[in-house]
A protein has these predicted regions:
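Loop-to-helix transition at the N-terminal end of transmembrane alpha-helices
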Residues: 34-42
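Short hydrophobic/aromatic helix or loop-helix immediately within or flanking a transmembrane segment
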Residues: 61-89
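Start-transfer (signal-anchor) and selected internal transmembrane alpha helices
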Residues: 1-23
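Helix-to-loop transition at the C-terminal end of transmembrane segments
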Residues: 20-35
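Short alpha-helical transmembrane interface motifs in multi-pass membrane proteins
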Residues: 66, 91-95, 143
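Membrane-embedded helix bundles of polyisoprenyl
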Residues: 13-20, 85, 98-117, 121-166
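Hydrophobic (often cysteine-bearing) scaffold residues that line and stabilize catalytic clefts
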Residues: 37, 76, 106, 110
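Extracytosolic helix-loop segments that constitute the early lumenal/periplasmic catalytic or substrate-binding loops
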Residues: 41-66
Length: 166
């Protein structure tokens, strides 16, 4: 029973973060400024399938001649999506699962960091506030900056790691 209660704060964080993920439950994909995310995941998969490691030039852009897309845009977020695609999910669902994992990871790491200073309740509140920050919603659901959004888990993880090193 004690083991179950040790996971309770993390489960509360996940439940409180779920409404931020509601736009991902709609069928298809949502409209945003940079709405080529699924195509980029498709091109990353095509590059990896052709053993272009690390993928730099994607084969389907540039009118079929290829385009050095991943020289200019960081591919980390798409590797997360590729993981889900290799598990058998389609490209659209893999992209949505990529966003879900980014949101949950950033909420979890913010909880770990804030718990050190504010306790469990403060960690939960900080985690939810970090998830619902308006900049994050604009970043994902308006701008479509998934590479930038994939950096959000690392900010509290970095500070938590530095605190733990002391």
């Amino acid at each position: 029973m004690k083991k179950i209660f040790s996971y309770l704060p993390f489960l509360m964080v996940i439940v409180l973060v779920l409404p931020a993920l509601l736009p991902l439950l709609n069928p298809g994909f949502f409209v945003m400024h940079d709405d080529e995310q699924v195509g980029r995941l498709f091109d990353l998969h095509a590059s990896l399938a052709a053993f272009h490691i690390p993928p730099r030039i994607v084969p389907n852009l540039g009118f079929g001649y290829g385009y050095p897309f991943f020289n200019f845009y960081p591919p980390f977020a798409y590797y997360i999506g590729e993981f889900f695609h290799l598990l058998g999910f389609g490209y659209i669902l893999s992209t949505k699962l990529m966003l879900v994992s980014i949101f949950i990871a950033s909420a979890y790491f913010m909880y770990l960091f804030a718990k050190q200073f504010l306790g469990k309740v403060g960690g939960i509140v900080s985690s939810v506030a970090y998830t619902y920050a308006s900049y994050r919603a604009i970043d994902v659901y308006v701008r479509g900056a998934f590479a930038e959004a994939s950096s959000f888990p690392f900010i509290p993880l970095l500070f938590w790691s530095l605190y733990k090193l002391q």
